[in-house]
Swiss-Prot record:
Family: Belongs to the liprin family. Liprin-beta subfamily.
Segments passing through the bilayer: none
Coiled-coil stretches noted in the UniProt entry, renumbered to this chain: 156-405
Name of the protein in its database record: Liprin-beta-1
Tissue specificity annotation: Widely expressed. Absent in liver.
SAM domain span: 647-711, 719-782, 804-876
Length: 1011
């Protein structure tokens, strides 16, 4: 290729030389026309010029003698003509003038030659680059050839290993044949002995011994398999314990940092106390100077100072309590370290696996008990001070209530609280405030009521959204005496945490559980679905109503309109009724509540709700909070401890009514005798006797019965189907309300929702499937708390991806309005876009968002603006996951028109139809491993509870040993198969059949071997 290019370049250069030589030859002409133009008269004499040039060249090459000889041969006329022509040519004055033109042409040709030389150099460089690429490709080809050769070598090795395995198999067959030969030899010997001595008792005993040895080998094999299985669980438990130790060390550091911050804050509080004391002294002096004789005011001021001192003392006591709990936490950490040391020492001994497993479980139970004792430790009692009032308005009136600090440290993840001292500010009278941390681990409730003060203690914790924050607004006309104010505040302050949402049962213990040892709850509808232990006490229907009563209070502000009065009276979250002295303030309370209620609700007074439910047909997309709870929240709990099997017919019917399945009672009321009837019923019985044709209704009933027979208390069982219809509004899918309401889909069914269930509910869009999947994951992350979703903007300056996950569809539309995309925000209605889909779904990216918003592709600035704010909102980790998803080879852009295709069984799979059905039934919309780790979304590619950063090299080596042990298990299984085949051949022998009737011991062993 390079030689062809060089030949082309040489030809081009030769052509240029010829052109230049021809141009020089034209200098001799004296014409005024361009010799290269088609109209030039020299075009015909160009040949003569070439001949003259050739003549000149030949003459220069000849010698003098040859020139003279040639001159003699030229005719005289020709010579004279040439002389005249040449002399006249030299005497004319045209040559110098025309020479300039030719010189210009020559210069132009020289320039063209230089440009061609440059082009030649460029072409040369390109040729060299192409040569480099060719060499690189040849190198890659060599590498691929080497890889192919390596693959062929591996294939040869695999073939060799296969042949070696076949030879081993042949060896085993040869051994079996040898054993058969030995067996025949033994049989011949037996016949000889029988003929000679007629005594075969010894031989029978040997045969029995052989049988016993074979059975012992089988038992040893089973023991080895059990030990290997226990080794796997032990390694998993060891790794989980390492993770727990790492978490405990991290929490220890956090607690130490918190302790240091609390020390600094205590010092700042002391400084504030000194400043307050100096301020009080100054005010006292001022009062003494201005109002002599008013000793009562001075005494009140002293009382106020004493109360402030008591407040600081309570803070110091709380700090000491936290120090004590930190020490307890350190002791528990030391116990974990000791337990880890014992595990490391005992992990190499094969015979102590089971004991180690038992000891680790016992130690974990002891640690869990120690942590539960920590949580039962009393919190410091609140020190309350009554406010003071100055009737003359000459001094600064102050109302200060002590901060109530309650620290609740869970088993593994104690939260930290950082308190900051605010800047000096003058504040108008503010309502009582209550602060709590999101996860409920550490709660700081502060009741501060000031009119004008120099300093105010604030907390950096997030404000609670509970009803305890909705207090009275003070005004100038609301100033009362000291005694009346303290009497009004007494009921509210005696229960400082009455407005906080309750901790779900089992939350603390669930954090103590081993992530490898937790029992994964799955729905199974097989033959043993309704088996319940006889001594197991189940939860009754009134208990479910009681727990529902607790969550219904803080689910929605408008939900108070649907609650009966007796449930409000028994609820721990209700606001105490105003006293006669504070009747003036009730109007302010209702005004404040009216501002904070949901937009769909029309009233807040329970007496205004004349109709409990919507009467004009099915569930509409705008129903909102008009939907009430299906359960009677005011039931008595007299049969709380009665097992479901002993429930009467009326109780079972009422329970079915609460589950929303009351329509089947007319056809099945005669069939239901007690709770045992439902527990023993099969799928066919439910469909035939109760007439339940709807598959989701049968699934709902079976899940509810399974929950009654389970000892676990979960929050998803407390969410009924009316809550799910409101939840569809929150995630932006109100168009499916009718289908979900007809299917009576509740929180438990959401937890176990499968793809087939969604398809039966007529949800066929891929986007809507992913929306429901990520919404269920958000509910699992938040432990199915009814009010975990964020419907309204709170603090826009501190938006984290964990908070964006909780955004509803309406909140996302509010965010679009805040980023100047208000005209496109209504396009998200009914799209299923919520915070969980935006953050947790890798396939949902900016392009999908822009398509759903109907932003045209040509509006690049708008799309860039949306991408900037979208990436800032979801965080860096979610961006990385979305980029990884886009880089996958099978990535397809998520659109609103994509449909879910139901799986179809091929013709070859009809033999395994039952197995296929079971596998499809386990295909959950949201897999069980998603959202199980509370407080964070599961990391991509890792199992919940595992963190690869905490693994050491020893752990990885042990994992490799576990993989090797699995190979050992397979070898043992193959060896046991050979032993079983050998014993089977021995049993089929006629010798054993003959002696089975003679010897009773032989018959016993035969029966044992047949088992």
């Amino acid at each position: 290729m390079m030689s062809d290019a060089s030949d082309m370049l040489a030809a081009a250069l030769e052509q240029m030389d010829g052109i230049i030589a021809g141009s020089k030859a034209l200098e001799y002409s004296n014409g005024i026309f361009d010799c290269q133009s088609p109209t030039s008269p020299f075009m015909g004499s160009l040949r003569a010029l070439h001949l003259v040039e050739d003549l000149r060249g030949l003459l220069e090459m000849m010698e003098t003698d040859e020139k003279e000889g040639l001159r003699c041969q030229i005719p005289d006329s020709t010579a004279e003509t040439l002389v005249e022509w040449l002399q006249s040519q030299m005497t004319n004055g045209h040559l110098p003038g025309n020479g300039d033109v030719y010189q210009e042409r020559l210069a132009r040709l020289e320039n063209d030659k230089e440009s061609l030389v440059l082009q030649v150099s460029v072409l040369t460089d390109q040729v060299e680059a192409q040569g480099e690429k060719i060499r690189d490709l040849e190198f890659c080809l060599e590498e691929h050839r080497e890889k192919v050769n390596a693959t062929e070598e591996m294939l040869q090795q695999e073939l060799l290993s296969r042949t070696s395995l076949e030879t081993q198999k042949l060896d085993l067959m040869a051994e079996i044949s040898n054993l058969k030969l030995k067996l025949t030899a033994v049989e011949k010997d037996r016949l000889d002995y029988e003929d000679k001595f007629r005594d075969t008792e010894g031989l029978i005993q040997e045969i029995n011994d052989l049988r016993l040895k074979v059975s012992e080998m089988d038992s040893e094999r089973l023991q080895y398999e059990k030990k290997l299985k226990s080794t796997k669980s032990l390694m998993a438990k060891l790794s989980s314990m390492k993770i727990k130790v790492g978490q405990m060390q991290y929490e220890k550091q956090r607690m130490e940092q918190k302790w240091e911050s609390l020390k600094d804050e205590l010092a700042s509080l002391k400084e504030q106390l000194e400043e307050k004391e100096s301020e009080v002294k100054r005010l006292q002096e001022k009062l003494v100077c201005k109002m002599k004789g008013e000793g009562v005011e001075i005494v009140d001021r002293d009382i106020e100072v004493q109360k402030m001192k008591k407040a600081v003392e309570s803070l110091m006591a709380a700090n000491e309590e936290k120090d004590r709990k930190i020490e307890d936490l350190r002791q528990c950490l030391n116990r974990y370290k000791k337990m880890q040391d014992t595990v490391v020492l005992a992990q190499g001994k094969d015979g102590e696996y089971e004991e180690l497993l038992n000891s680790s479980s016992i130690s974990s139970l002891l640690d869990a008990q120690g942590f539960s004792d920590l949580e039962k430790s009393p919190s410091p009692t609140p020190v309350m001070g009554s406010p003071s009032c100055d009737p003359f308005n000459t001094s600064v009136p102050e109302e200060f209530h002590t901060t109530i600090l309650q620290v609740s440290i869970p088993s593994l993840l104690p939260a930290t609280v950082s308190m900051e001292t605010s800047e000096k500010s003058k504040l108008t009278p503010k309502p009582e405030t209550s602060f709590e941390e999101n996860d409920g681990n550490i709660i700081l409730g502060a009741t501060v009521d000031t009119q004008l003060c120099d300093k105010l203690l604030t907390s950096s914790l997030q404000k609670s959204s509970s009803l305890g924050n909705l207090k009275k607004e003070t005004s100038d006309g609301e100033k009362e005496t000291i005694q009346k104010t303290s009497e009004d505040r007494a009921p509210a302050e005696s229960r400082p945490f009455g407005t906080l949402p309750p901790r779900p049962p089992g939350q603390d213990t669930s954090m103590d559980d081993n992530p490898f040892g937790t029992r994964k709850v799955r729905s199974s509808f097989g033959r043993g679905f309704f088996k319940i232990k006889s001594n197991k006490r189940t939860a009754s229907a009134p208990n479910l109503a009681e727990t529902e009563k607790e969550t219904a209070e803080h689910l929605d502000l408008a939900g108070a309109s649907s609650r009966p009065k007796d449930s409000q009276r028994n609820s721990p979250f209700q606001i105490p009724p105003p006293s006669p002295d504070s009747k003036k303030k009730s109007r302010g309370i209702m005004k404040l509540f009216g501002k904070l209620r949901r937009s769909q609700s029309t009233t807040f007074n329970p007496d205004d709700m004349s109709e409990p439910e919507f009467k004009r047909g099915g569930t509409r997309a705008t129903a909102g909070p008009r939907l009430g709870w299906s359960r009677d929240l005011g039931q008595s709990n007299s049969d709380l401890d009665m097992p479901f099997a002993k429930w009467t017919k009326e109780q079972v019917c009422n329970w079915l009514m609460e589950q929303g399945l009351g329509s089947y009672l007319n056809s099945g009321k005669h069939w239901i005798a007690s709770g045992q009837t439902l527990l023993q019923a099969s799928q066919q019985d439910l469909e035939k006797e109760l007439g339940i044709k709807h598959s989701l209704h049968r699934k709902k009933l079976q899940l509810a019965l399974q929950a009654l027979g389970s000892e676990e208390e979960t929050n998803h069982g407390k969410l009924d189907f009316n809550w799910v219809t409101r939840w569809l509004d929150d995630i932006g899918l109100p168009q499916y309300k009718t289908q979900f309401d007809e299917g009576r889909v509740d929180g438990r069914m959401l937890h176990y929702m499968t793809v087939d269930d969604l398809l039966s509910l007529k949800v066929v869009s891929v986007l809507h499937h992913l929306s429901i999947k990520r919404a269920i994951q958000v509910l699992r992350i938040n432990n199915f708390e009814p009010n975990c979703l964020r419907r309204r903007p709170s603090d826009e300056n501190t938006i984290a991806p964990s908070e964006v996950q909780k955004w509803t569809n309406h909140r996302v539309m509010e965010w679009l309005r805040s980023v100047d995309l208000a005209e496109y925000a209504p396009n998200l209605r009914g799209s299923g876009v919520h915070g969980g889909l935006m953050v947790l779904e890798p396939r949902f990216n900016v392009e999908t968002m822009a398509q759903l918003l109907n932003i045209p592709p040509n509006k690049t600035l708008l799309r860039r603006h949306l991408a900037t704010h979208f990436n800032l909102l979801i965080g860096a980790e979610a961006q990385h996951q979305k980029r990884d998803a886009m880089e996958l080879p099978d990535y397809v852009l998520l659109t609103a028109t994509a449909k879910v295709k139901p799986k179809k069984l091929a013709f070859s799979n009809f033999g395994n139809l039952r197995k296929k059905k079971q596998e499809d039934g386990e295909e959950y919309v949201c897999p069980m491993e998603l959202g199980q780790a509370s407080g964070s979304a599961s990391k991509k590619g890792f199992k919940p509870g595992l963190d690869m950063r905490l693994y050491e090299e020893d752990d990885l080596d042990r994992l490799e040993q576990m993989e090797d042990s699995e190979g050992t298990v397979r070898q043992i299984g193959a060896f046991s198969e050979g032993i079983n085949n050998l014993t089977h051949m021995l049993k089929e022998d006629d010798m054993f059949k003959d002696f089975a009737a003679r010897s009773p011991s032989a018959s016993i062993t035969d029966e044992d071997s047949n088992v």
